[in-house]
C-alpha cells in the first residue's frame, strides 16, 4: 500500500529528437509569452498536429498554440475512455500526435505497451509537486493535479455529510450516492484504484464497491451527469473530480465540497505517440512547452473557469485559482501508476460487469 501523504504527485512525458530541441528553444518558458518566433517556427516542416484531449480548456489551448506557432491542430475532444479505446484499437496504425487527459495510470499503461515516446522533458521550473511526479523514462509530462474523489452535496438538504468512506455504506445513504463510470470517465479509474490501494488490495476494494452497489449506488457516465443527478435531487452525495466539484459550488451556493480521508491525487498529463512522424513529434514537444509556458498557463487557468481550470499547478511561480482549498488542508495519497495502470482494463471490466450493470 502506498503511504498516505499530504503532498501531491504528478508525472512527465515523452521523447526528444534533435529537431525538437530547435523547436523548443523558440517556445521556452523563459520567454515572456511562451511563443516561438516566426523564423524558428518556419525552420521545420509543418504538419497537422493531431491532439486527443479530454480537457475542458483544450479548444482554447489549441487555438492559442496555433496562433503562436502557425502550426495547424486537429483536435479530437472526447472523454478519456473513448480516446483510449481509439488509441488501442489503432495501435498498429495510429492517427494521433499527443494525448492530454487526467490520470497517470492511463499513460503508464500506454508506456508499458511501447506506445509513448520516451526521454523528453520540457525546459521548465517544476515545483515540488511536479518534480515528484516525473517518471524515470520521461514518457509523459505532468500539466496539473486535481483530486479524486471530492464529495459534493447540497448543504440545505444534508446537514451532516459522511465523514469517512465507510460511512457511505450506512443505511442512511441508501440510494443517495452517485459516481462516474470508469469506462467513460478518465478520473474515475484512479479513484477506484486509490480506494483499492487505501483498503489494502483489489479484492478489498471490490468488496467496498459491491457494498456500495448493494446500498443503491447510482452510476452516471461522467462528472456532468453525476452532478446533474445531485442538483435534480436524484442523489444526495456526488463523488466527482475536485475541479468539477469546486466548479459546481461556484455556480450554486447551496452546494458544498468535502474531502474524505484520503483522496487520491490525480495528475493530468500529456504523452506523445511513439509512432508519429518526427515532424509531428517535434510539434507535440512544442505544444507541451507552450502549455507549460506563462502564456499556456494563463489559458489553462482561464479556458474552463468552473471546471478543469481548477487545478493545482506543477510549476514554480504559478498559483492555483483562489476557489481551491490549500492542498495542505487535505489528506491525500499517491498511487503508483505503473502498478495500477496495467490493471485498468481488468478492473474496469470487473466494475462495469458487477457494479454498473
What are these regions (language model features)?
Residues 1-31:
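Secretory targeting and sorting signals
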Residues 150-157, 193-196, 267-280, 299-303:
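A bilobed periplasmic-binding-protein/Venus flytrap-type ligand-binding module shared by bacterial periplasmic
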Residues 50-74, 248:
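Short, polar/charged alpha-helical segment
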Residues 147, 207-212, 251-274:
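Periplasmic-binding protein-like
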Residues 273-334:
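Mature extracytoplasmic/periplasmic domains
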Amino acid at each position: 500500500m502506498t503511504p498516505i501523504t499530504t503532498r501531491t504527485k504528478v508525472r512527465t512525458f515523452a521523447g526528444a529528437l534533435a529537431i525538437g530541441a530547435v523547436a523548443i528553444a523558440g517556445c521556452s518558458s523563459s520567454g515572456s509569452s511562451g511563443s516561438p518566433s516566426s523564423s524558428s517556427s518556419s525552420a521545420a516542416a509543418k504538419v497537422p498536429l493531431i491532439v486527443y484531449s479530454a480537457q475542458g480548456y483544450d479548444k482554447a489551448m489549441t487555438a492559442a498554440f496555433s496562433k503562436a506557432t502557425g502550426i495547424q491542430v486537429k483536435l479530437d475532444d472526447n472523454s478519456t475512455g473513448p480516446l483510449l479505446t481509439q488509441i488501442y484499437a489503432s495501435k498498429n496504425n495510429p492517427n494521433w500526435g499527443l494525448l492530454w487527459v487526467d490520470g497517470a495510470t492511463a499513460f503508464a499503461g500506454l508506456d508499458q505497451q511501447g506506445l509513448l515516446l520516451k526521454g523528453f522533458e520540457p525546459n521548465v521550473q517544476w515545483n515540488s509537486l511536479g518534480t515528484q511526479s516525473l517518471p524515470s523514462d520521461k514518457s509523459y509530462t505532468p500539466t496539473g493535479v486535481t483530486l479524486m474523489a471530492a464529495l459534493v452535496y447540497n448543504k440545505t438538504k444534508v446537514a451532516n455529510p459522511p465523514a469517512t468512506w465507510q460511512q457511505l455504506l450506512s443505511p442512511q445513504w441508501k440510494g443517495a450516492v452517485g459516481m462516474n463510470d470508469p469506462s467513460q470517465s478518465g478520473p474515475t479509474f484512479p479513484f477506484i484504484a486509490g480506494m483499492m490501494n487505501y483498503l489494502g488490495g483489489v479484492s478489498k476494494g471490490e468488496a467496498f464497491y459491491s457494498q456500495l452497489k448493494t446500498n443503491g449506488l447510482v452510476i452516471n457516465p461522467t462528472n456532468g451527469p453525476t452532478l446533474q443527478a445531485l442538483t435534480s435531487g436524484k442523489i444526495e452525495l456526488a463523488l466527482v473530480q475536485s475541479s468539477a466539484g469546486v466548479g459546481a459550488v461556484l455556480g450554486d451556493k447551496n452546494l458544498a465540497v468535502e474531502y474524505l480521508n484520503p483522496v487520491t491525487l490525480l495528475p493530468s498529463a500529456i504523452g506523445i505517440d511513439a509512432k508519429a512522424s518526427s515532424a509531428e513529434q517535434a510539434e507535440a514537444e512544442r505544444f507541451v512547452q507552450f502549455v507549460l509556458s506563462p502564456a499556456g498557463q494563463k489559458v489553462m487557468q482561464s479556458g474552463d473557469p468552473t471546471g478543469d481550470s481548477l487545478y493545482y499547478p506543477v510549476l514554480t511561480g504559478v498559483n492555483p485559482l483562489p476557489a481551491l482549498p490549500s492542498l495542505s488542508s487535505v489528506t491525500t495519497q499517491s498511487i503508483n501508476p505503473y502498478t495500477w495502470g496495467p490493471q485498468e482494463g481488468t478492473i474496469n471490466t470487473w466494475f462495469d460487469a458487477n457494479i454498473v450493470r
